[in-house]
Amino acid sequence: MPFKSLDELRAACLDLPAGSDTAAKAVASRQDTLTKPQGSLGRLETIAAWLARWQGRDMPKLDRVKVFVFAGNHGVTAQGVSAYPSEVTVQMVANFAGGGAAINQLARIAGAELDVIPLDLDHPTGDFTQVPAMDEKAFLAAVSAGYDAVTKDLDLVCFGEMGIGNTTPAAAISAALFGGGAEKWTGRGTGVDDAGLKRKVVAIEAGLKRHAAALADPLGVAAALGGRELAAIFGATLAARHLGIPVLLDGFVCTAAAAPLARLHPTGLSHTIAAHVSAESGHRRLLEALGLPPLLDLGMRLGEGSGACLAVNIVRSALECHARMASFAEAGVSEK
């Protein structure tokens, strides 16, 4: 386990490589020579430079792309915050293994490997309206599981999650980190009715009140109000930064899971791109707070890494244009 204390983890969050300015500038310079008006490929151009910065090479590659789906169960579901029972988490992990979920199809189309990592599904986190979701030991174990999952031979990673009830901790973390109260951040998740939405708001308000003493520390927020799969995504996002691997973030839960890193370090999420904006109401607000403009807006709210996986082919397109387009000189095309 790479992190044996919160102090060790905090130190790792403050020691973040900045990426390669040289590689990013080389990509930008090449983009300006290609057979197109400068800047006309929009974000495809900046995506190519982003890849170069974090891979540390002026000709990035996407030979190995992997989607990680972390799964966990939540004690706060006892408050009636989800339309589905917690056993669906285990059932969906089996569905992933059988190839029957949306993420299986999207990963295949994207040319990405899929790694599903269940986290102690038989032991839900604590109900954060009553106790911290995780004590220090459980939190560090989950963070370490995510950190250890990411390996240096990967070129791009996507993070997703599965966990019945996990939009509730996502909203709670967002409220704790950025303020505004529970109602501002709370949506319908898997489709709760008005009464269920009210229960979510009440549960989040109770959690924020009970754990008020922990809310000044982003790591305290993640432990008290989060979940194992969220902590693992946090750890995986940190590992990717240390290893120089760019990250596509999925929806609301995934973004909330990574958000404490941005509160610990001003450039904590610079190696990430928000793949899409979810239909879950808090996600757009969270992306705005983090300064992460999404690539896609398709009205999705599935999770599983589905939106992140869809964005892989946009990143592939950016790289293909950068690598294979001719320059004006090579093509014999006159410049203005």
Curated annotation (Swiss-Prot):
Record function comment: Catalyzes the synthesis of alpha-ribazole-5'-phosphate from nicotinate mononucleotide (NAMN) and 5,6-dimethylbenzimidazole (DMB).
Enzyme class: transferase
Keywords: Cobalamin biosynthesis, Glycosyltransferase, Transferase
Species this chain originates from: Mesorhizobium japonicum (strain LMG 29417 / CECT 9101 / MAFF 303099) (Mesorhizobium loti (strain MAFF 303099))
Pathway linked to the protein: Nucleoside biosynthesis; alpha-ribazole biosynthesis; alpha-ribazole from 5,6-dimethylbenzimidazole: step 1/2
Keyword Nucleotide-binding listed: no
PANTHER family, A to Z: NICOTINATE-NUCLEOTIDE--DIMETHYLBENZIMIDAZOLE PHOSPHORIBOSYLTRANSFERASE (PTHR43463:SF1)
Annotated catalysed reactions: 5,6-dimethylbenzimidazole + nicotinate beta-D-ribonucleotide = alpha-ribazole 5'-phosphate + nicotinate + H(+)
Gene: cobT
InterPro entries: Nict_dMeBzImd_PRibTrfase, Nict_dMeBzImd_PRibTrfase_bact, Nict_dMeBzImd_PRibTrfase_N, Nict_dMeBzImd_PRibTrfase_sf
Active site: 304 (proton acceptor)
Gene3D superfamilies: 1.10.1610.10, 3.40.50.10210
NCBIfam families the UniProt entry points to: cobT_DBIPRT, PRK00105.1
GO terms classed as biological process: cobalamin biosynthetic process
EC numbers on record: 2.4.2.21
Official protein name in the record: Nicotinate-nucleotide--dimethylbenzimidazole phosphoribosyltransferase
Molecular function per GO: nicotinate-nucleotide-dimethylbenzimidazole phosphoribosyltransferase activity
Lineage per the UniProt record: Bacteria, Pseudomonadati, Pseudomonadota, Alphaproteobacteria, Hyphomicrobiales
Family designation: Belongs to the CobT family.
